[in-house]
Regions:
Chain B
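Coil-to-alpha-helix initiation sites in intrinsically disordered, low-complexity, charged segments
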Residues: 1-2, 41, 90, 254
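Hydrophobic secretory-pathway targeting helix
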Residues: 2-42, 485-489, 557-558
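Intrinsically disordered low-complexity regions specifically enriched for long asparagine
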Residues: 12-21, 43-51, 70-71, 101
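Sec-dependent signal peptide cleavage junction
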Residues: 33, 37-56, 60
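Polytopic transmembrane helical bundles with strong interfacial aromatic enrichment
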Residues: 50-51, 56-627
Length: 270, 627
């Protein structure tokens, strides 16, 4: 019986140590919830909002950034794809059907092997086959208007003329059901979740530790300050935090309503 | 008292096991018939994609009757809503399914692995005519027998849980896999038959031709068990990398295609190796428990030897396991870069830091047990001075493996370190450093084993000095090669070469293990023994290393099982069948590890209870033997 108890105590202690380590010593990152299905008001969409939708799809639902980033080197960077698209059409290796830059970018998303940038093909295929998934099917499942939004985003990013047309008709019921990307957030908590503020800040129940704690920020800062801190984060640096940590583009990412909701929320957090 | 008198004959409990197994078999046998919709009154809100999209029947549709008939037999994956998932007050369906599946898997891994090495040990016993091997093989299989019925119980619980909480999912899977489920049920029956004949016929088939028949039954038991696992693996991997269905999840009619999906073979290999390592560790824990409870030096000697053998099996399988895991991960990337990056670069990345701690614990405890084992030999004094250096290298490698890529820090810490990445420690966080560390750790663990193996021997061959020199040269060359590959290709070239160089690192490690083992076996053939090995002369603390090994293995399996399943994210079947249940979210690491810990506590409680029962029944048997 003594051995039995000793062994039980030892085993439980080991298990509890692992549980403690995983809970207390490892940062608890809250994964994004499954995509929410929401309705989209396409009738009143402006080109700025459409580009914004493309930005959000690129960094969110499209999961493009997983590979097209400067860290991993897994896929070519797309900052200038709006510019180089026309040049690719003249490349002797190009075997697609596109006639314009816009068509080339669309084709590269729905038929990735039409042209593979040198060095980024599937191993052993001599860059004839792309490892990229078709973005309109499978786990990504972008709708045609979302593909167009991403093209508009690329063109705007490269500084070329935006040739994509805004969607003229309301999307089908199925489109509406799935298009969650550009839906404006309905509450400050949704804004926090949508833009991942909690990854760095303590806010709305999230426990980020890289940036200042915002749970009582309203007691110290007024709305003007808070608005500026979102739009131009390097304008004022909180003591003890290095400059340049916060992405500077929330000013163009957040919709006006979302920004105001967030600022109100922070101002009331006392 | 002879050890053979400890053998417990359990006819009444055998009947109970048989009844449980028969019940499970009957249950599994009926499962494929659940394909029929009337078995599933729950989930009436389910809308199948084809039904939703199907227009009213037209003459042309009638003309296409034959092609449509195919779609009627194999419906697309249903589009479920929250209300299609039955709720039972006070019970969370996902946690219930999670724990039932995990407990089933732990016990199943154990009962599939033990017959593999029991077969090998029995064959060694036959070849060497050393009865100790036969006794030990019998005791191993005895331990797994109780676990066999518990495996069946948890398997049944899992199926019931799926019927109650995920009826539409089960219906969809049964719609595709029903022939394999039927085969599974038959094979389960065959496995039970093989196991019971193998175990209960052990003493009746001890001599002559009967022994050969017995060994053949052991071989059949392994074949049937392995095929069983491969079938279950097909279901699991289909959920991760579906094949043989179209984009809507409509089965295209070729059973081999859905079985032979992209991740089937990598998982098959990984699970076979991991099961052996795991089975060895649990049997090692059993031997440790018996060692600690032993009252005579003869018992201590027997269970020391059993623990050593079990640990040897566990470590032998542990060494190639990272390579099988590497292949599996590479295939996940090859199937879907998204899934691969979710696994290694997304929210799951931190789980690999926990994995590093666990594998570090496995390696350290295994090495510690080997070092303690040197006390059995008087010749070990020649090598004990090297242990501290080996320990230093292994701990150093563990720390590299353990270094995270990005640290979550307080603002003060962030400022002090100069940004999110430390100047010197930052580079240790990426895979090339970790690949280098794990390969060196494996090589030094192998070195520990080699020292242990030769500590009681003196080579008598004329070329012993040359052999030693060659071995040292192979070790040195491999370590330099691994380090250079890791540093140069890891930091000074692009990603493609980083990945490719890891293959050469693995090849270096395998070269060391295989070539040095061959040289060692030849060099110590006919070697002189320093003194007889003193089995049983082990400190009690060494036995806790075996427990640490078993508990860490169990926890690690639970964690990795969670990751394997969770990288599907909000999909029942990745990309074709979405999970719309209220529990479709990916939990935080803390949440997941709490569930894993609860599962491990339940598992260990049952296992230790089985050991304790074995102790009680053994005492009874001893008492009867004295009478």
């Amino acid at each position: 019986m003594k051995t039995f108890l000793k062994v039980v105590i030892f085993s439980v202690a080991v298990i509890l140590f692992y549980a403690f380590y995983a809970n207390e010593m490892i940062p608890q990152v809250k994964p994004a919830p499954p995509p929410v299905e929401a309705k989209l008001d396409m009738g009143s969409l402006t080109m700025e909002q459409f580009i914004q939708m493309g930005d959000t799809v690129f960094h969110g639902k499209g999961t493009c950034e997983l590979c097209h980033n400067p860290v991993g080197g897994r896929a070519p960077l797309l900052d200038q794809v709006g510019k180089v698209a026309e040049e690719r059409l003249k490349d002797p290796r190009y075997k697609g059907k596109a006639k314009t830059g816009e068509e080339y970018i669309r084709e590269s998303m729905v038929e990735p092997s039409a042209f593979v940038v040198v060095g980024f093909g599937v191993k052993g295929t001599n860059d004839a086959q792309s490892p990229m998934p078709v973005v309109t099917s499978g786990a990504i499942g972008l709708k045609p208007f979302e593909v167009d939004a991403v093209i508009a985003y690329f063109q705007q990013k490269a500084g070329v003329t935006i040739t994509v047309q805004l969607p003229k008709e309301a999307p089908s019921a199925d489109d509406e059901e799935k298009a969650h990307v550009a839906a404006p957030a309905k509450s400050a908590e949704e804004v926090v979740n949508k833009y991942g503020c909690g990854a760095c800040h303590k806010i709305a129940g999230q426990q980020g530790a890289l940036g200042p704690d915002l749970t009582k920020i309203g007691a110290k800062r007024n709305k003007d300050y808070l608005r500026r801190a979102v739009i131009d984060p390097n304008a004022d640096i909180a003591p003890g935090f290095p400059a340049g940590m916060m992405p500077p583009d929330f000013g163009v990412k957040l919709l006006a309503g979302e920004l105001e909701m967030l600022v109100d929320y922070m101002a009331k957090s006392k | 008292m002879k050890l053979s008198s400890l053998v417990v004959r359990e006819t009444s409990s055998g009947k109970r096991r048989f009844i449980v197994s028969l019940f499970f078999f009957v249950f599994l046998f009926t499962l494929p018939f659940f394909k029929s919709a009337e078995f599933f009154p729950i989930g009436t809100n389910t809308v199948y994609a084809a039904e939703q999209a199907a227009p009213a029947e037209t003459p042309s549709a009638k003309e296409e009757g034959k092609s449509e008939a195919k779609k009627e037999v194999y419906p697309p994956a249903p589009k479920l809503t929250e209300s299609d998932y039955p709720q039972v007050k006070g019970i969370n369906g996902r946690i219930m399914a999670w724990l039932a599946a995990q407990l089933h898997l732990w016990f199943a891994a154990f009962v599939l692995a033990v017959p593999i090495f029991v077969f090998v040990i029995e064959a060694i016993g036959m070849a060497t005519k050393d009865e100790r091997y036969d006794r030990m093989a019998y005791e191993f299989i005895k331990v797994s027998l109780t676990a066999y019925s518990i495996t069946a119980v948890f398997g049944g619980l899992l199926v019931f849980t799926l019927i109650v909480f995920y009826p539409d999912f089960l219906k969809y899977m049964a719609g595709i896999f029903s022939p394999t489920m039927l085969a599974y049920a038959f094979l389960f029956f065959a496995e039970s038959a093989c196991l019971y004949i193998y175990y209960y016929g052990w003493h009746a088939m001890e001599k002559g031709t009967a022994k050969w028949i017995h060994l053949t039954i052991g071989w059949m038991l392994n074949v049937v068990g392995t095929v069983l696992m491969f079938l279950a693996n097909a279901w699991v991997t289909f959920m991760m990398s579906p094949h043989g269905v179209d984009a809507n999840g409509v089965f295209e009619g070729n059973m081999w295609h859905v079985i032979h999906n992209h991740l089937w073979n990598p998982i098959n290999l990984h699970r076979v190796i991991a099961n052996v390592a795991y089975g060895g560790s649990v049997v090692g824990a059993y031997a440790a428990y018996k060692f600690l409870s032993a009252r005579t030096s003869e018992e201590r000697a027997h269970y020391d030897w059993m623990g050593y053998t079990a640990n040897f099996i566990a470590i032998s399988a542990l060494l190639p396991l990272p390579f099988a895991g590497y292949w599996l991960t590479a295939e996940i990337y090859a199937y879907s870069q998204q899934m691969g990056i979710t696994l290694m670069g997304g929210v799951f990345a931190w789980l690999f830091i926990i994995q590093a701690v666990l594998i570090g614990a496995l390696f350290l405890s295994a090495n510690y047990y080997l070092w303690c084992g040197m006390e059995r030999s008087k010749g070990a004094v020649r090598y004990t001075k090297y242990i501290k250096y080996i320990a230093f290298v292994i701990v150093g490698c563990f720390l590299v493996w353990f270094t995270p890529h990005t640290l979550i820090m307080t603002p003060g810490e962030l400022k002090a370190i100069g940004g999110p990445y430390h100047k010197y420690l930052g580079p240790l966080g990426i895979m090339p450093a970790k690949n280098t560390a794990v390969n060196i750790m494996l090589i030094f663990t192998f070195l520990s084993f080699m020292l242990y193996r030769r500590c009681n021997k003196i080579a008598t061959v004329s070329w012993a000095a040359t052999g030693n020199a060659i071995q040292i040269a192979i070790f040195a060359a491999a370590i330099i090669n691994i380090a250079v590959l890791g540093v140069y290709y890891g930091y000074f070239t692009n990603t493609v070469y980083k990945v490719a160089s890891s293959v050469l690192q693995v090849a270096s490690t395998l070269t060391v293990i295989i070539s040095c083992m061959i040289i060692d076996v030849l060099m110590f053939k006919g070697a002189k023994e320093v003194a007889p090995l003193q089995w049983g002369k082990m400190p009690d603390r060494s036995q806790y290393a075996l427990f640490l090994l078993a508990v860490s293995f169990t926890w690690l399996m639970g964690l990795m099982g969670f990751i394997r399943s969770a990288i599907r994210q909000h999909w029942h079947v990745y990309t074709v069948f979405r999970d719309n249940s209220p529990d479709a979210f990916t939990p935080t690491i803390g949440y997941a590890t709490k569930i894993v810990s609860v599962g491990v506590i339940i598992f260990m409680a049952i296992v230790i209870f089985i050991f304790w029962l074995g102790q009680i029944s053994a005492k009874k048997s001893v008492s009867e033997a004295h009478h």
